[in-house]
Each structure stands twice: as structure tokens, then as C-alpha cells.
């Protein structure tokens, strides 16, 4: 499996990472068996997935706690570990982010908050350093939280050896440039799938110009691109899938038809549609990292199968043409 450089950090890892939002549980995902989640993380690493991504907000610290438990059973040097900062519920700030499981969560990108976040995350994760630290959401008011001070705090943590690389999520092209102006930005994390390609217009060209890597989350479009969703599949009231444009009837029909047209390729590569989609997503953008969630060892094992798919050039061109035709 080929390793890909994370920006200019000097860290290199295979393209596929494990996202741990779901194992945090909470109202969004429901209860999980933590012992099963720990085994899922162990399985992911055993199968070649080396990047484990988490965040304090996932389950209000619970995801980090579960990842920390899993790390007790994994060689830390084999894992690239990322978490996030900038969302706060220890105290109020002028910027309300949202209410999560009945708790008011605020944005706080001050130096003090970032440093506190990192110290708390290191404790929960049971490690002495983070490989990547992302700012989870950006401030809507740079007068309140100057970006220069945010980046300065992260660079200080890097100098101290507490983080190895700096990342940012939910950004604009201008914000990427400003991060690079004030320090070294190595990677951004954004939503990207075969059906959601907005970042191709501005973010990807900016990242390519500045040597910033991209990590895509939700590559399977909330399950739509697994091949298991039909036109008759329904979701309970309040599910975010009901408001996702990709799940609306016309768009859903296009996606299902596209996937049905790739059945011969699943036979050729001895893989599932989900694995095929993950492999293609990684081919859509040179150097792209892809995050996939898993709550069970079997799901982690299945995701890792995408690492071993080597798409023929002609097949990749055919599939990209199909994707472009419905974009």
C-alpha cells in the first residue's frame, strides 16, 4: 500500500483513514457497544488503516475516550492520530455553534481554548502527542478570534512537540490562504463524495497551489453509495438523509442507476460496491485522503478492502465519466 504525504509535515500514511464520529454515540448515532468499537479500531489498524480521526465533540468526549482505550492495545507508532479543537462547552462564548445532546456548544478559537483542548485530548487519548490537530469549525468573526493568534497557538504546540501537523476543517479558499500566511497548514478536512464535489471548484485548486493535503469525509454519502439504498428506502423523521439533496428522488435514482452499472466491476475486482466507490473516490483527486466510519470489526475490515483495489486506467476513466454525467 502506497503512503501519501500529509502536506509538508513529513508524515506519510495510506489514503484510507477511520472516522470515529459514530462510535461516539449520542442522540445522532445512538448507543454503541464500546468493546466492539475498540475492536473495530484494532481491526482497522490490523488491516492497514493507519489514520484514526476523532474529535472532542463526537459524543461529547466519548469518541476520544473510546479511541484512547483502543490505543492501549495498538502500537502508537503505527497510527496517525488526529483530533480537533475549537468547539467549547466548558464555558459560554459569543458564538453559539449548536446544541448537542442538550448541551450548548460554542466556538472558541482563542489560544487559551486551543491549548486547553489539546491538553484535555492528550489525556483522554492517553498519548503524549497528536499527529494532526484540526480546527473543527472556523470563527464567523475574525475580530473576536484573530486567525493569526489561532495559528500562532497551533504553531507553538507544534514547536513543543504536542502536535506534528496543523489542519483545518470547514474552510474557504481565503481562509486556507490566511492559514498558510501565518504558519504551515498541512491538511484540510471537508465533505467530498462522488455526488458532492463542491470543493473541486475552489478549495482543491488552492490546496494544490499551496501544498495542502485534503481529507474527505462522508465519501459514501451517508450510505447512499454503498449500493444498499433503494428507491423504497425510507428514513425516520428528523434524519439528515431526508434533507440531503442526494437522497431526493431524482438524484437518488441517478446514483442507484450509476451503481447498478458497475456491478460487473465488483465481480472483476472481487469487491463490494462500497469498496469500489472508496477506491474511485481516492482516484478522483491526486493525493486525496478518505475517511470512512466503522462501528464493528466487520465494517472496519470491509472498508480496508478498498486499500487493495488497483483500478485499471480504463475502468477508472469509465467510472469517472459516469460520475461526471450526473454531476
Residue ranges and their predicted role:
Residues 3, 138-327:
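Beta/alpha (TIM)-barrel catalytic core signal, keyed to glycine-rich beta->alpha loops juxtaposed to Asp/Glu
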Residues 13-17, 50-51, 78-82, 129-132, ...:
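Structural preference for beta-strand elements that scaffold enzyme active sites
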Residues 22-34, 100-115, 141-143:
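Active-site mouth loops of central-metabolism enzymes
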Residues 31-44, 110-124, 172-177:
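Short, acidic/polar
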Residues 9-28, 84-104, 134:
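N-terminal small/glycine-rich loop or linker at the start of catalytic domains
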Residues 122-141:
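Active-site groove signature of glycoside hydrolases
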Residues 1-80:
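N-terminal binding-site loop/beta-alpha segment at the start of enzyme catalytic domains
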Residues 8, 70-76, 123-126, 179-183:
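Acidic (Asp/Glu)-rich catalytic clusters
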